[in-house]
Regions:
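A conserved beta-strand element that flanks and buttresses the S-adenosyl-L-methionine
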Residues: 117
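Conserved S-adenosyl-L-methionine
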Residues: 200-212
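A short glycine-rich, Lys/Arg-flanked "PGG" loop and its adjoining helix->strand segment in the class I
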Residues: 131-143
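Conserved class I S-adenosyl-L-methionine
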Residues: 1-54
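Short catalytic micro-motifs in class I SAM-dependent methyltransferases
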Residues: 120-124
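C-terminal alpha-helical "lid/dimerization" subdomain adjacent to the S-adenosyl-L-methionine
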Residues: 150-197, 205
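Class I SAM-dependent methyltransferase SAM/SAH-binding core
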Residues: 60-107
């Protein structure tokens, strides 16, 4: 599993210059107009849910990547600490956040935040490290603080990738190179039950057109 996680980390480092093409549906991720309208509607649904949550004054964003959601968070919170393992992705993130290059499984802030946020990360956490990751989330929260996540919907196929057995996926870059990554698409009820056993109570939803899973909650 460590080899797979190393390959996944390298994939996202190499993908950094083209990562945003997926979110903005450019190039090989382009959609025909009606499909693009559905994509934008789902993105707006998730964004509106985050804004209505709302984040609070201080936010810890884990696996922040190139900053697609960081830029939304800095408009909603007074302070955002954005952590990612790759310098290549953080170089494209926003200077309005406090950027930290670190492995999210190892980094400890020693602080408590009003909100812990992560987008399109949980589906890349291997099952053997799932509980460990949520322990890190818990450590960054005071009892009344909260968590919010956005991820791929269970039926989402918007990436250029091939599903493999055992929660893996083969992804390709625009230059043709391929990488293996972890990828598990969760159903809302399935994920809510899994984290409930770890002491979190989350209200999770699929977006109207099925592209995203999103929602939040707090320690139970």
């Amino acid at each position: 599993m460590s080899d797979l996680m190393t390959e996944q980390k390298r994939y996202y480092a190499e993908r950094a210059p083209e990562y945003d093409d997926w979110w903005y549906r450019r190039g090989r991720y382009a959609l025909e107009p009606r499909a693009l309208e559905r994509w934008h509607a789902d993105a707006a649904e998730a964004e509106d849910a985050l804004e209505a949550f709302p984040p609070g004054r201080s936010v810890l964003e884990l696996a922040a990547g190139t900053g697609i959601w960081t830029r939304k968070l800095v408009r909603l919170a007074d302070r955002v600490v954005a952590v990612d393992a790759n310098a290549e992705t953080l170089a494209l993130n926003t200077s309005d956040a406090e950027l930290v290059q670190a492995d999210v499984f190892e980094w400890e802030s020693g602080e408590r935040f009003d909100l812990v946020f992560f987008s399109f990360w949980l589906s890349h956490v291997p099952d053997v490290r799932f509980d460990e990751f949520w322990a890190h989330v818990r450590a960054a929260l005071a009892p009344d603080d909260r968590v919010f996540l956005v991820d791929s919907g269970a039926g989402e196929t918007g990436h250029t990738g091939t599903d493999q057995a055992g929660g893996e996926e083969t992804r390709s870059l625009s230059d043709g190179r391929t990488f293996r990554i972890v990828k598990r698409r969760w159903l809302p009820d399935e994920l809510a039950e899994r984290v409930r056993r770890l002491g979190f109570e989350l209200d999770l939803h699929d977006s109207a057109n099925g592209h995203f899973l999103y929602g939040g909650g707090a320690l139970a």
